[in-house]
Amino acid sequence: MKPGGNTIVIWMYAVATWLCFGSTSGWSFTLEDNNIFPKQYPIINFTTAGATVQSYTNFIRAVRGRLTTGADVRHEIPVLPNRVGLPINQRFILVELSNHAELSVTLALDVTNAYVVGYRAGNSAYFFHPDNQEDAEAITHLFTDVQNRYTFAFGGNYDRLEQLAGNLRENIELGNGPLEEAISALYYYSTGGTQLPTLARSFIICIQMISEAARFQYIEGEMRTRIRYNRRSAPDPSVITLENSWGRLSTAIQESNQGAFASPIQLQRRNGSKFSVYDVSILIPIIALMVYRCAPPPSSQFSLLIRPVVPNFNADVCMDPEPIVRIVGRNGLCVDVRDGRFHNGNAIQLWPCKSNTDANQLWTLKRDNTIRSNGKCLTTYGYSPGVYVMIYDCNTAATDATRWQIWDNGTIINPRSSLVLAATSGNSGTTLTVQTNIYAVSQGWLPTNNTQPFVTTIVGLYGLCLQANSGQVWIEDCSSEKAEQQWALYADGSIRPQQNRDNCLTSDSNIRETVVKILSCGPASSGQRWMFKNDGTILNLYSGLVLDVRASDPSLKQIILYPLHGDPNQIWLPLF
């Protein structure tokens, strides 16, 4: 029986006598070279008393900063540590939560998955039932100075917690108020003041508002909205499906070939409608952390050719598949072998994307960095700007002319020449060439099997939405009824008002404080190509400047280009 009399099967561990240094979070010890080194796990604090959007944002950023070293970053998304070879003194972080009632509990998070493994309240510590002996041994290093240690008979997965709570996540409210109540419930469980269903419900709240918010910028954004408006509400389908898909998304991204998935992953929008994700591009601003799934293959190409330096303690190398995709570019048109004729030297062109299985728009991304259609290679005619791109036999073409790298920002580059794939016109039938890279819309591409632009709202400073207003753009109160707040994200890197897809979000100059406008997409210029970054900014690739709410003052009704500083007026989030 647990103190207080709640009926629950628990196992009580004998507690060894430890030297106590007065810390409420406990000390962990690791044995190296026959020496014992005490080390306190890092502690991050958060209080619901007077919580603000900024205090919560700072808290989640601090949690992320402690969960990952930043040594392993793939497609701009940090990867959590591999549990194999991870020293025990680096295995956990502690999150100390307090509330208006001045009650305090300390959660323990596993750095390998950002998940809660247990918590401390006063002189008692409680742990979810571990999945294996290794985890069972690891948690013995947590809260070593408590008088009482208990392990629940249940694990911490959502299915079991929902069963115990008697409710599903989609019916459990989240927000600052629910978190306040959850802290009290966890605290009073040690005295018998909390029943098991309430305890399970409280775990669900804490896990979503801390672990899931650390994993996803999207979920962090949802929690910020609740705090901003002092709102209590249950998560919508977009949140639930992200939570359920984190492991599969991590696997798909790490096993992707230059960002393209071997098979799609289905997610849901806020209204419950389903959509499939075929590539990493839309996920870069959505996912903050990935669980480690596999080591990068030796030949894999990373964002802008920067390879992460991480130790490989085992042989679990990523699959490195060879997906078959369409390559979507300027104005949503596809890379196409002209007239479906595969004789050597036939031109590659822009053409409306097909929905059938015609080979001349299907491209295999090969491990050798060739891009092939019907077994033949996408090949540049030479290494000078302006030469055309053709289909050619892979075995007889010049090897360097058939090699391409696909960057996360949508650039397809020939390494030999440092020239990039380009469409100098946005019309159907335009012959593709290679050109000097200026990060223009005419040089933006996306290997995917979803040929339609991704439609989204874009939320920025103070939870306000980016809105097109004739030729101007600024932020206003968000409303699902406002069509002018809907944006189509094109594969070529342009951001277009859903109401008029012939227009583009545009900077007509590359200098700081240039006012961003809505202008014709016709130029397909460098000032019309953008990238959603993992840090929440929207980057103009050519200038290196980001979208910024001028002076953090929405009343000025100006969005400008500005150097990166990372303040809230430069942070944006696509919501679906």
From Swiss-Prot:
Pfam families: Ricin_B_lectin, RIP. AMP binds at Y115, V116, G156, N157, Y158. 2-gamma repeats lie at residues 543-570. 1-gamma repeats lie at residues 417-449. Glycans are attached at N45, N271. Its EC number is 3.2.2.22. In the N-terminal section; belongs to the ribosome-inactivating protein family. Type 2 RIP subfamily. Ricin is highly toxic to animal cells, and to a lesser extent to plant cells. This is Ricin. It comes from Ricinus communis. The lineage of its organism: Eukaryota, Viridiplantae, Streptophyta, Embryophyta, Tracheophyta.
